């Protein structure tokens, strides 16, 4: 049975009695209880992600991210992996390909599932799939049959979402998911105010995403909608890695760290997922170094 909790996905999948019993024993508080308490004025201790890797620069951050993904593949060669399209991930992909060529990791049995994709583009040559084929799938020699993509031309896009979900469910969840964070805190194309309980879905893009997304297209592009793995999948992923780099991400990084988990800032879900880590460089973490000292 899938969780129907109106607050957030949890490992008890709607078995509230078991959740309450666990929290009595541990002295902890479930997120749903925490949310109600905060709405009534209680001051709760600040939640932190499970693990944060603070790296000196972009190169070190990229290498750490690559190592974390490849470590999962070494332990499970046929792992199901989800990777993000985007310029900040290029060096991570280069390192992963270098490691494969050096025999340090083998992707021949690894399977991949698309994180997200733009919809309604006039020219799809520079979409997410095009980026991934150019910068990772092609160089790494990943066969097409090992890649699950959203059918962006389907007449029934909800059915296309369910088809991808079924691939993930059949695997027992994604084994490792690498993410970047948007300037508005989005993960994949899970925009602000995304429902944490949803799996794959079609989304209307936030104005920030419409604007910032222009950088991925040579001649600009009208962006209106997207399709994405939902945040619920992240709760059922073996390892979720959020990489955040550059001084331009310092503001959203501070919001993520200094906010309670909230659907207003999707990236705060990293404070809730069972196996979530953040990999960041000092530029992005400049405003939260005081918090990182205690993790």
Residue spans for each PLM region:
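Cysteine-centered metal-binding/redox modules
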Residues: 1-43
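Ligand-binding beta-strand-loop-alpha-helix segment within the catalytic cores
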Residues: 44-51, 105-176
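Glycine-rich N-terminal segment of FAD-binding domains in flavoprotein oxidoreductases
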Residues: 75-101
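Glycine-rich beta-strand-to-loop/alpha-helix junction loops that act as flexible
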Residues: 83-88, 179-183, 245
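A glycine- and small-aliphatic-rich helix-loop capping segment at beta-alpha/alpha-beta transitions
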Residues: 95-106, 130, 192-202
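ATP/nucleoside-binding phosphotransfer catalytic cores, i.e., glycine-rich phosphate-binding loops
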Residues: 237-295
């Amino acid at each position: 049975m899938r969780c129907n909790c109106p607050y957030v996905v949890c490992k008890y999948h709607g078995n509230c009695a078991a959740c309450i019993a666990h929290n009595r024993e541990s002295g902890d508080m479930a997120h749903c209880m925490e949310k109600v308490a905060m709405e009534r004025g209680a001051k709760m201790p600040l939640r932190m992600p499970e693990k944060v890797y603070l790296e000196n620069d972009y190169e070190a951050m990229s290498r750490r991210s690559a190592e974390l993904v490849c470590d999962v593949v070494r332990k499970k060669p046929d792992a199901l992996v989800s990777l993000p399209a985007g310029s900040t991930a290029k060096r991570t992909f280069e390192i992963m390909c270098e490691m494969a060529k050096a025999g340090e990791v083998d992707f021949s049995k690894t399977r991949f599932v698309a994180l997200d994709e733009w919809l309604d583009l006039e020219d799809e040559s520079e979409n997410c799939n095009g980026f991934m084929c150019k910068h990772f799938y092609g160089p790494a020699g990943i066969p097409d049959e090992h890649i699950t993509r959203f059918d962006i031309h389907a007449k029934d896009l909800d059915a296309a979402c369910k088809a991808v979900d079924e691939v993930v469910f059949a695997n027992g969840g994604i084994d490792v998911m690498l993410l970047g964070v948007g300037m508005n805190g989005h993960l994949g194309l899970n925009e602000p105010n995304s429902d944490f309980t949803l799996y794959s879905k079609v989304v209307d893009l936030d104005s920030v995403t419409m604007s910032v997304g222009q950088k991925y297209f040579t001649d600009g592009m009208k962006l209106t909608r997207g399709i994405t793995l939902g945040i619920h999948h992240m709760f059922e992923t073996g390892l979720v890695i959020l990489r955040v780099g550059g001084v331009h991400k310092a503001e959203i990084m501070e919001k993520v760290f200094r906010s309670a988990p909230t659907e207003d800032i999707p990236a705060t879900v990293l404070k809730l997922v069972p196996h979530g880590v953040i990999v960041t460089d000092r530029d992005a973490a400049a405003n939260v170094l005081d918090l990182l000292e205690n993790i």
